[in-house]
């Protein structure tokens, strides 16, 4: 059963907080070095063709590249199409779309068609499970760590303020 308070916290979090949480989950689950690329605003377009995080690792001499799209909206077919195109264009080994929200029925039904492009989905329930399993943003009692989320939102505000000053 999904931790509803945690799911609610994720759904009301900023994109910046979701990017940082997703990067932390990927790093702790062995995806190697995780880079947050240039998109930090909800309506901003990614200059990297549909993804915001890049994970690079290697197993022996075999390099591995995973691209991740983080959104704060329901996962729709269009988003799967964009990520599949990005996986193919960047020659990535895997693409992951992460959202604290739901997956539309059509996207869920068509997801098997994206296996050739190696596109996976992490929805809100799965993200909550990963965070709880790894002990990220959750208290020992299982409830969300509200102070952690508050600190992440503050970091996001400061980064956005800095980026606005840099753009001037």
PLM segments and residue spans:
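Mixed-charge (Asp/Glu-Lys/Arg
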Residues: 1-168
């Amino acid at each position: 059963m999904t931790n509803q308070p945690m799911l609610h916290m994720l759904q009301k979090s900023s994109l910046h907080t979701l990017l940082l949480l997703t990067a932390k989950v990927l790093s702790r689950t062995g995806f190697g070095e995780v880079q947050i690329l240039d998109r930090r605003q909800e309506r901003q377009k990614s200059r990297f063709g549909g993804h915001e995080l890049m994970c690079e690792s290697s197993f022996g001499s075999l390099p591995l590249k995973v691209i991740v799209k983080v959104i704060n909206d329901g996962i729709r077919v269009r988003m799967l199409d964009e990520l599949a195109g990005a996986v193919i264009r960047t020659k990535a080994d895997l693409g992951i779309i992460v959202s604290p929200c739901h997956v539309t029925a059509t996207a869920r039904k068509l997801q098997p068609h994206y296996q050739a492009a190696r596109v996976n989905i992490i929805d809100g329930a799965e993200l909550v499970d990963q965070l709880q399993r790894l002990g990220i943003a959750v208290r020992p009692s299982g409830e969300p760590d509200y102070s952690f989320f508050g600190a992440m939102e503050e970091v996001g505000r400061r980064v956005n303020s800095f980026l606005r000053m840099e753009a001037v």
